[in-house]
């Protein structure tokens, strides 16, 4: 068993070797909770949910931490504009995010810390950096890290000299170098938020928050704090570069052995961004598409590639997922056997190669085709049915798809009001059959069929699905 992942530092695929045998520590940057989550958040969550599932399937004990940034300029701005307390805003959007992730089939992280819960550790790290002369406090009370003190600055992103980009993000006349970044922001008055600290009233910089939460919940002794740090490629610089820098300077070790980054989601070729006004919120998408279909669509492009949102491609993904559920419906419930060795080998070959989803889904498609052919030849062979159920269970465990009952899957897209009308007609049809009014029963079946609804009579009653 060898898993290869693309390491952003080495800029190539490398063999994953854990810091401790049989264990994986994984940290993924979570959202800044000032608004609902968009498809960019969803894609990142799905990408590293797949990584976690693969590691767990391979027998690793994964300790997965994903944070919430609950203090930030954007949150403060929203509070000032709306008059709503910051705590109420962040609580609402944390709940909203978790609801969205649940509908997308994302496994909950082991720990979901909030930045404000780790202020004491942030202070310790900042104090250490000040004592070492790596950080400095300005007359206004802001504290910056002096990046010239870190010879390795820029190693992660390859953009250590990108002065224009850094100064645009965080400019200040009091910086010694435009690349210096804030560890602590002094309190600026009533339009700001402040916490009492050893350095005066203020609040943490964005980057120090993640370093502190990693130290608190995941860090191990040794050359690296954790195995894998992951997130969107938009975070590579300056956020991840600055995280790596401050941890290296404060602790004397590297933050992560491996860094992984997923590609952007674009709309009409532009990166999805709330600031650009082109965010496609997950909640908006879920009003139109089932969460599992959306998951499968976002999963179907390799995680490092950009994904330009396309309704046509999404519908193609649904048809592909339909095939899986039609096979699941065909074999029905029953004994779950061991999966086909050939199928499992091909599936894992793809996923072990930096989560090559194209190869993995090709293995899935071949399995679906072969399974249907074998069922055509031997429709009642129980051993075959058990193997197919085993194959489907593997897809559920690894890819997070196929967990629904086929009936529920094929009912998606029907509104609650429509469902109620369909159930009423099914009840009326049952009463007509009981009264031997078969003409009326057939009339109801045909009426529903004309609306795209197929009826399935079973020993336990009549079921229905969208045809």
Curated annotation (Swiss-Prot):
Cofactor: binding details: Binds 1 zinc ion per subunit.
Key word Isomerase present: no
Annotated GO biological process: cysteinyl-tRNA aminoacylation
GO molecular function: ATP binding; cysteine-tRNA ligase activity; zinc ion binding
EC number: 6.1.1.16
Pfam families found in the cross-reference section: CysS_C, tRNA-synt_1e
Motif 'HIGH' region location, chain numbering: 31-41
Top enzyme class: ligase
Reactions that this protein is recorded to catalyse: tRNA(Cys) + L-cysteine + ATP = L-cysteinyl-tRNA(Cys) + AMP + diphosphate
Keywords (A to Z) from UniProt: Aminoacyl-tRNA synthetase, ATP-binding, Cytoplasm, Ligase, Metal-binding, Nucleotide-binding, Protein biosynthesis, Zinc
Co-factor requirement: Zn(2+)
Region of interest: Disordered: 155-174
Amino acid composition bias (Basic and acidic residues), ranges on this chain: 158-174
UniProt: ATP binding residues: 274
Placement of sequence motif 'KMSKS' region: 271-275
Compartments (UniProt record): Cytoplasm
Xref: PANTHER family: CYSTEINE--TRNA LIGASE, CYTOPLASMIC (PTHR10890:SF3), CYSTEINYL-TRNA SYNTHETASE (PTHR10890)
Quaternary data: Monomer.
UniProt family annotation: Belongs to the class-I aminoacyl-tRNA synthetase family.
Name listed for the protein in its UniProt record: Cysteine--tRNA ligase
Gene responsible for this protein: cysS
């Amino acid at each position: 068993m060898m898993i290869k992942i693309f390491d952003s530092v080495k800029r190539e695929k490398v063999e994953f070797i854990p810091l401790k045998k049989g264990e994986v520590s994984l940290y993924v940057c979570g959202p800044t909770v000032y608004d609902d989550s968009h498809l960019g958040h969803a894609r990142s969550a799905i990408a590293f949910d797949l990584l976690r599932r693969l590691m767990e399937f391979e027998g690793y004990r994964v300790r997965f931490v994903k944070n919430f940034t609950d203090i930030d300029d954007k949150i403060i701005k929203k509070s000032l504009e709306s008059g709503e307390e910051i705590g109420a805003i962040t609580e609402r959007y944390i709940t909203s995010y978790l609801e969205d992730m649940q509908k997308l089939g994302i496994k909950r992280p082991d720990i979901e810390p909030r930045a404000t819960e780790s202020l004491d550790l942030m202070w310790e790290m900042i104090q250490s950096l000040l004592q070492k002369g790596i950080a400095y406090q300005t007359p206004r009370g802001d504290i910056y890290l002096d990046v010239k003190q870190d010879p390795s600055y820029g190693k992660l992103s390859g953009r250590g000299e990108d002065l224009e980009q850094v100064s645009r993000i965080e400019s200040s006349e009091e910086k010694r170098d435009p690349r210096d970044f804030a560890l602590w922001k002094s309190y600026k008055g009533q339009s700001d938020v402040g916490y009492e600290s050893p350095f005066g009233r203020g609040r943490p910089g964005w980057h120090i928050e993640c370093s502190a939460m990693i130290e608190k919940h995941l860090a191990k002794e040794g050359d690296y704090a954790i195995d894998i740090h992951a997130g969107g490629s938009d975070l590579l610089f300056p956020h991840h570069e600055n995280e790596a820098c401050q941890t290296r300077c404060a602790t004397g070790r590297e933050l992560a052995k491996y860094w992984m980054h997923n590609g952007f989601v674009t709309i009409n070729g532009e990166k999805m961004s709330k600031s650009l006004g082109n965010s496609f919120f997950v909640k908006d998408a879920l009003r139109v598409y089932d969460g599992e279909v959306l998951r499968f669509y976002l999963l179907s492009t390799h995680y490092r590639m950009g994904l330009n949102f396309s309704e046509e491609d999404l519908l193609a993904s649904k048809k592909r997922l339909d095939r899986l559920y039609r096979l699941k419906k065909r074999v029905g419930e029953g004994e779950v056997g061991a999966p086909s060795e050939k199928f499992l080998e091909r599936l894992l070959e793809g996923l072990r190669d930096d989560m090559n989803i194209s190869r993995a889904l090709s293995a899935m498609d071949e399995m679906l085709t072969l399974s249907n052919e074998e069922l055509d030849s031997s429709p009642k062979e129980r051993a075959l049915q058990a193997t197919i159920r085993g194959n489907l269970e593997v897809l559920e465990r690894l890819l997070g798809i196929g967990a629904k009952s086929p009936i529920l899957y094929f009912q998606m897209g029907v509104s609650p009001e429509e469902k109620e009308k369909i159930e009423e007609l099914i009840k009326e049809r049952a009463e007509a059959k009981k009264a031997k009014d078969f003409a009326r029963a057939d009339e109801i079946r045909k009426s529903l069929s004309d609306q795209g609804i197929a009826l399935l009579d079973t020993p336990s009653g009549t079921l229905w699905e969208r045809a």
